[in-house]
A protein has these predicted regions:
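Amphipathic alpha-helical protein-protein interaction segments
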Residues: 52-86
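Short, solvent-exposed alpha-helical "recognition" segments
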Residues: 35-52, 83-84
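Short, amphipathic alpha-helical "recognition" segments used to contact nucleic acids or chromatin
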Residues: 1-18
C-alpha cells in the first residue's frame, strides 16, 4: 500500500518530468504497485500538469511583456485550442 509520502514523491517526480520508471525508483515503489494504483497515476499526471501550468504562466507573462519568442510560443498554445462553433 502506498503512503502519502510515496504519493507526494510520485507527484513531485511528475512535476520534474521524470519517467514513470524513474519515478518508481525514486518513490521506492514497484512498477506493478504504481500501475495498479489509480491515485498514484493521477498524482503523477497532476504533477506533470502543474509543472506545465507554471511554464505556460511564465510564457504568458513574458508574451504580455512583448518578448517576441514568447509571443510566438504563446500563439502556438492558442492555435492548438479547438473552440466550439456557435
Amino acid at each position: 500500500m502506498l503512503t502519502e509520502r510515496n504519493l507526494q514523491d510520485i507527484e513531485e517526480c511528475g512535476a520534474r518530468q521524470f519517467t514513470e520508471e524513474e519515478t518508481c525508483i525514486i518513490a521506492d515503489v514497484s512498477e506493478k504497485e504504481y500501475e495498479c494504483n489509480p491515485e498514484a497515476r493521477r498524482r503523477y499526471r497532476r504533477g506533470m500538469l502543474k509543472a506545465q501550468f507554471e511554464v505556460r504562466e511564465t510564457v504568458r507573462k513574458m508574451a504580455a511583456e512583448g518578448v517576441p519568442q514568447m509571443v510566438k510560443i504563446f500563439q502556438s498554445y492558442i492555435d492548438r485550442i479547438e473552440f466550439p462553433e456557435e
